[in-house]
Amino acid sequence: MVAAQAPDRFLQGELGCGAPLDDVELHLDRDAVLRVRTQRLALARWRDGRLDPLADAEGWWCTGDAAALVPTEDRALCVQIRGRIDGAIHSGGETVFPEQLSQRLLYQAQEQALPLEAVLFLPIASEEWGQRLVALVRCRNGWIETEGWAAVQASLRRMTSAWLSAEQPMQWLECAVLEPTLEGKWERVRWQSWLESQELGLLR
């Protein structure tokens, strides 16, 4: 644990993880990746049959998370995690975090009482953009049958119309079997293979 948010700040709607703890130093590298330095860091981890130091020579540990350090009204710093850099894609000059977008869309759907049960954003290669997103979605039984797939797609596009262009899926695909593992993780290789198996008229 390197940061904590006061309950009153959470209730006021402050975004992020709160302020760094007293014995923690935080730093963003030139790629906006969060680095942590504290005496509470483990010295090393066991990897490939040997001890691999966790921190660099100056004591900084790279978290692998893209982040922002945002000043608050009382001049404290609030940590905001944007997403895992190993899951990020580059689209049209923007760094896009698919997992964060999935959570955002599910939240918006819940706010609008739309029966969207699961969504997974996956990248495909694009000559113009580098990569573009395609969205796999699973809806509650009966929604597509009642409204029609075209109407469902229109609803999803309206919800994402204010997003950055690089964040908006170029295509929406219904996937009735879409679900994470029992641990709540996505088997991205599996679903990427499923996506590639579809006969799609995608603009690359």
PLM features: residue spans?
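Active-site and channel-lining beta-strand-loop segments
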Residues: 26-28, 65, 176-181
